[in-house]
């Protein structure tokens, strides 16, 4: 009997060892690349690429175009123009159920479509990405929850953002730095319009730097009223938050060092995936760029 029990125990231990070894040997089947690094902002992803932490950064085209074309910091890097990821649209988000607040944001964007919206976009080189028109329909026009009234009564609105030029960035250094950007200027214009139309006294928006991966939680617990920072609209985000109408077009792009062109530059996405098999990829955690690398959920 003891001998039989010993044999059974040996078999069980052997099976457990095989399972453990298999688990230790498991790898994530990324869409491309062998390793994925995540950081707290898209700017950090670019900086990580520059430091040599990764071979490829995946970020928003809106941001990539700005840094590649308007600064010297990344003059030795390039966008892989022929590698096409999914095209996207940006939206503004509030806590789930706060449709009345988002409705007022929509209303203002539509009203400003031919004025401030275009003027601000022109300032930051984003006129070709604009999506709102004067005849755009506000899908939340009938919303009547208390979220807008709360902002009116509090006389303040707190907006969460990350540094993400030309959407939101510091112009200048140290104490002289000024927060500017397309979304920053647009948010101010929207609140100014709403104050004028509804005779409200909401102060100029308060902008708070957030951990992008915590944006939903920060909306839910009331730390911020809005996420207004080039947020890609997805079905999951529309399910978990109240999201505005699309206001800016975007797509995800791959950034590499120009010196690595021979290694990663391809004529299409499929060719890029093959070339990037052994690459280390860096993205902002919780971003659309991360979803371009992670395997699709089954």
Regions found by a protein language model. Name each.
Residues 84-138, 184, 191-193, 258-270, ...:
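Extended ligand-binding regions for polar small-molecule ligands
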Residues 15-30:
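Sec-dependent signal peptide cleavage junction
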Residues 91-93, 158, 253-255:
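Residues embedded in well-ordered beta-strands
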Residues 68-87, 164-166, 188, 199-273:
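Acidic, polar ligand-binding/catalytic clefts
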Residues 35-42, 47-51, 60, 105, ...:
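Extracytoplasmic small-molecule ligand-binding "clamshell" domains
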Residues 26-46, 61-65, 99, 163-165, ...:
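Bilobed "Venus flytrap"/periplasmic-binding protein-like clamshell domains
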Residues 1-9:
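Positively charged n-region of N-terminal signal peptides that target proteins for export
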């Amino acid at each position: 009997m003891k001998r039989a029990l010993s044999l059974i125990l040996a078999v069980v231990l052997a099976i457990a060892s095989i399972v453990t070894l298999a688990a230790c040997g498991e790898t994530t089947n990324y869409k491309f690349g062998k390793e994925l690094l995540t950081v707290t902002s898209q700017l950090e992803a670019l900086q990580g690429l520059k430091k040599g932490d990764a071979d490829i950064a995946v970020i928003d085209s809106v941001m990539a175009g700005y840094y590649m074309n308007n600064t010297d910091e990344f003059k030795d890097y390039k966008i892989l123009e022929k590698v096409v990821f999914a095209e996207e649209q940006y939206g503004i988000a509030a806590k789930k159920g706060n449709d009345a607040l988002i409705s007022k944001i929509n209303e203002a964007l539509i009203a400003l479509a031919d004025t401030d919206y275009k003027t601000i976009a022109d300032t930051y080189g984003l006129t070709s990405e604009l999506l709102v028109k004067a005849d755009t329909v506000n899908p939340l026009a009938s919303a009547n929850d208390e979220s807008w009234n709360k902002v009116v009564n509090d006389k303040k609105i707190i907006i969460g953002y990350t540094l993400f030029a030309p959407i939101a960035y510091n112009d200048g250094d140290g104490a002289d730095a000024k927060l500017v950007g397309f979304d920053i200027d647009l948010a101010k214009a929207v609140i100014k319009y709403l104050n004028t139309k509804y005779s409200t006294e909401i102060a100029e928006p308060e902008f708070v730097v957030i951990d992008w991966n915590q944006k939903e939680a920060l909306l839910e617990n009331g730390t911020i009223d809005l996420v207004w920072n080039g947020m890609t609209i997805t079905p999951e985000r529309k399910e978990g938050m109240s999201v505005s109408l699309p206001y800016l077009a975007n797509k995800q792009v791959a950034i590499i060092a120009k010196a690595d062109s021979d290694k990663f530059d391809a004529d299409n996405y499929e060719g890029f995936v093959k070339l990037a098999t052994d690459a280390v990829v860096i993205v902002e955690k919780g971003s659309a760029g991360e979803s371009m690398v992670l395997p699709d959920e089954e």
